[in-house]
Amino acid sequence: MRQITDISQLKEAIKQYHSEGKSIGFVPTMGFLHEGHLTLADKARQENDAVIMSIFVNPAQFGPNEDFEAYPRDIERDAALAENAGVDILFTPDAHDMYPGEKNVTIHVERRTDVLCGRSREGHFDGVAIVLTKLFNLVKPTRAYFGLKDAQQVAVVDGLISDFFMDIELVPVDTVREEDGLAKSSRNVYLTAEERKEAPKLYRALQTSAELVQAGERDPEAVIKAAKDIIETTSGTIDYVELYSYPELEPVNEIAGKMILAVAVAFSKARLIDNIIIDIREMERI
């Protein structure tokens, strides 16, 4: 594995891959890698000739009340994990290289950002869109891999690729879970022992609602209530339980097409998110 920090060196490596006709799988991250990231790298390894992972803690996606400096960083640990996962190039640029001087052009994400977690993180997805546009232009990937754990981000990336006619295949990858269904997250370590026992109820709630739809329920409020009823048996505080079309993230008046049921729940020292994709068309084929 090569670790590259210099943009010009990355461009040379990409040029070489393209001259050899090699496909490139790209996994953008902010580092502090966990099993979810490594699953993305593994899938990219299976589907491409070369795998490039970036580690860049992007200052543009941190809000005024979010501590950019406190974000965990351990590049040596991450480099070892990336190499073991079969990554060919680990791109670790400096913020001064990614954002040299004043911006001449910026990006504002108009849709898909004012619901779910984006509602309380103004400007966050603008920062995501800016850095991904830069990274996509540098890496020129055949495919880009993102985890559905953050399904709203996947929806925003889908819109970015579509609106700017980027010749990139977006590959959403299912959430990696513990044996009891809890979505894997670095935040899980902040749960107390009792909260850790309760936390799998989030996914159980989502599954229950999906099963309700599969059984014929077509009232969005009933589907949402079924999930809420289960989550309310935990000690966590519900931030939201919401249902939207996917990936458009528009409100739904009836159960139809492809949708996302998403939840956010605050425990004493950890805020957990999870979601499930409900596709009526797929259910009708079963």
From Swiss-Prot:
Q: Does the keyword Magnesium apply?
A: no
Superkingdom of this entry's organism?
Bacteria
Positions with a binding annotation for beta-alanine = 61
* Predominant location category: cytoplasm
What does the record give as the active site?
A: 37 (proton donor)
One Pfam family of this protein, by short name?
A: Pantoate_ligase
Q: Which GO molecular function annotations are given, in alphabetical order?
A: ATP binding; pantoate-beta-alanine ligase activity
Keyword list, A-Z: ATP-binding, Cytoplasm, Ligase, Nucleotide-binding, Pantothenate biosynthesis
Location relative to the cell: Cytoplasm
Q: Which residues bind ATP?
A: 30-37, 147-150, 176, 184-187
State where (R)-pantoate binds.
Answer: 61, 153
Record field: catalytic activity: (R)-pantoate + beta-alanine + ATP = (R)-pantothenate + AMP + diphosphate + H(+)
Q: What GO biological process term is on the record, naming one? A: pantothenate biosynthetic process
Question: Which GO cellular component terms are attached?
Answer: cytosol
- Biological or metabolic pathway of the protein: Cofactor biosynthesis; (R)-pantothenate biosynthesis; (R)-pantothenate from (R)-pantoate and beta-alanine: step 1/1
According to the UniProt entry, what is the EC number of this protein?
A: 6.3.2.1
Q: How does it assemble?
A: Homodimer.
UniProt family annotation: Belongs to the pantothenate synthetase family.
> Misc remark for this entry?
The reaction proceeds by a bi uni uni bi ping pong mechanism.
Task of the protein: Catalyzes the condensation of pantoate with beta-alanine in an ATP-dependent reaction via a pantoyl-adenylate intermediate.
Annotated protein name in UniProt: Pantothenate synthetase
Q: Which species does this protein come from?
A: Bacillus subtilis (strain 168)
What gene does this protein come from?
Answer: panC
